[in-house]
Amino acid sequence: MSRKCELTGVGVLYGNNVSHSQRKTRRRFEPNLRSVKFTSDITAGEYRLSVNARCISSVEKAGGFDAYILKADDNVLSSNARTIKKKIIQTKTAKSL
């Protein structure tokens, strides 16, 4: 399992622990990932994605999972999220016809 958000693309960063004496040791800054089940109003399906905690509030602010994923850029989304986005677009166009 990669340590990367499926909706925002936020991954692991590398840096230093710096002590009081300015001694530097390497460390990893890992994202706060959570496995969350999102429900789509358009497809009426549930999708489990691994997202960071900040992304959860961003999804709520955007007006729900469907609105967020339709606004999201494709090169930031994971392959799983891109297939979900395609399903949402297909069912949205089928319902509008």
UniProtKB/Swiss-Prot annotation:
The keyword Zinc does not apply. It comes from the Bacteria. Gene3D superfamilies: Ribosomal protein L28/L24. One of its GO terms (molecular function) is structural constituent of ribosome. Keywords: Ribonucleoprotein, Ribosomal protein. GO terms for biological process: translation. It holds the Pfam family Ribosomal_L28. GO terms for cellular component: ribonucleoprotein complex; ribosome. Disulfide bonds: none annotated. Belongs to the bacterial ribosomal protein bL28 family. This is Large ribosomal subunit protein bL28. It comes from Rickettsia felis (strain ATCC VR-1525 / URRWXCal2) (Rickettsia azadi).
